[in-house]
């Protein structure tokens, strides 16, 4: 199991004078990357990369007080983030994104009306796609992933039952799989380990609150025991195998008045039981988890309420976790929602917002770690 938690300051190295024949080294540690063009308040909820010159990030913009915002989608072209046009679609936010190439990506979100929306990127624009349950008030799509055969997996619910929506890579044939055999369950994250093994995370009612939920689909459902907690939701997970699963999330408002920030939850399944591991800080949240190019667990993105001057990460070092801080002065109080690896490199992206409050002047925010 995990050992002691250490700390490391994510300071970047400044420029140095070099001979003309010696390449200037890349900056070390996490670096802020501008994500211009969004209307405050804005945030990026999820990010996915197909390579060093192609990534997508989605969220919302234009929030002001209790009013709903507008969906936000950004595209990385290898040198800059660009806001993509969603004016022809009526959506209040996008919740997740997954892509494979410059002409193929998928996103799920919330329209102005009822139900959930499924969007497809064709290399030029986002367009709505139809699926079983589209437009129904009791249908929700919360997360999307694409496997190595470019088949699309989404988790959510239909008719009050949580489950998976599965589609071929062309987006022509969709079907809901057998419902998850858990009552009062919500699924917030889907992760593909292989085309035949898909994991989901979320929460389930425990009578007085809710516990963390993790399950595996490999042609049939295997539901792991609940992750114990009073009001605990799983935001993301990394499965190295049936007996080696890490899950992250937040236990909401424990030990304080209403509105108190939650507690970060870092949990490990060893095939027999869940173990809660100290996250290195006690008040805040953990939102994203990412493996490296070899599939080994590498990074967790978080938010440390007790020190908001920089972004906060957990880095996996062998059997131990290390707290790593992002760049200084990049944002007033950066809040990270997600982290993902960059295929073909040893790099990573993270996304979120410039402060933990989704109200003006908060803006969309991204950081990158180069190999």
Predicted segments with their positions:
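N-terminal export signals
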Residues: 1-17
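Residue-level hotspots at or immediately adjacent to binding/recognition sites across diverse folds
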Residues: 10, 19-371
């Amino acid at each position: 199991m995990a050992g002691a938690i250490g700390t490391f300051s994510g300071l970047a190295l400044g420029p140095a004078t070099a001979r003309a024949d010696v390449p200037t080294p890349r900056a070390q540690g996490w670096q802020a990357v501008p994500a211009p063009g969004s209307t405050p308040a804005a945030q990026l909820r999820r990010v996915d990369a197909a390579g060093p010159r192609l990534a997508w990030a989605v969220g919302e913009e234009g929030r002001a007080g209790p009013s709903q915002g507008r969906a936000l989608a950004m595209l990385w072209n290898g040198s800059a983030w660009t806001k993509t046009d969603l004016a022809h679609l009526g959506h209040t936010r996008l919740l997740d994104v997954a892509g494979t190439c410059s002409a193929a990506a998928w996103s799920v979100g919330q329209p102005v009306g009822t139900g959930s929306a499924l969007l497809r990127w064709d290399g030029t624009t986002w367009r709505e796609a139809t699926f079983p349950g589209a437009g129904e008030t009791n249908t929700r799509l919360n997360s999307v992933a694409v496997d190595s055969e470019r088949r699309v997996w989404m988790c959510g619910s239909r008719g009050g039952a949580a489950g998976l929506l599965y589609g071929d890579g062309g987006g022509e044939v969709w079907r809901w799989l057998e419902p998850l055999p858990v009552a009062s369950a919500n699924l917030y994250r889907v992760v593909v380990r292989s085309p035949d093994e898909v994991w989901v995370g979320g929460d389930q009612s425990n009578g007085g609150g809710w516990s963390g939920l993790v399950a595996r689909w490999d042609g049939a459902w295997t539901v792991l025991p609940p992750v114990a907690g009073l009001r605990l939701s799983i935001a993301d997970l990394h499965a190295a195998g049936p007996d080696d699963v890490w899950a992250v999330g937040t236990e909401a408002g424990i030990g304080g008045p209403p509105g108190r920030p939650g507690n970060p939850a870092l949990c490990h399944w060893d095939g027999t039981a869940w173990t809660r591991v100290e996250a290195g800080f006690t008040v805040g949240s953990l939102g994203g988890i990412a493996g490296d190019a070899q599939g080994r667990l590498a990074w967790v993105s978080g938010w440390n309420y007790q020190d908001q001057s920089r972004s906060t990460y957990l880095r996996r070092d062998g059997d131990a976790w290390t707290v790593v801080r992002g760049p200084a002065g990049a944002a007033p109080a950066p809040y990270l929602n997600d982290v993902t690896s960059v295929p073909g490199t040893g790099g990573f992206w993270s996304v979120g917002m410039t402060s933990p409050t989704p109200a003006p002047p908060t803006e969309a925010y991204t950081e990158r770690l180069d190999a």
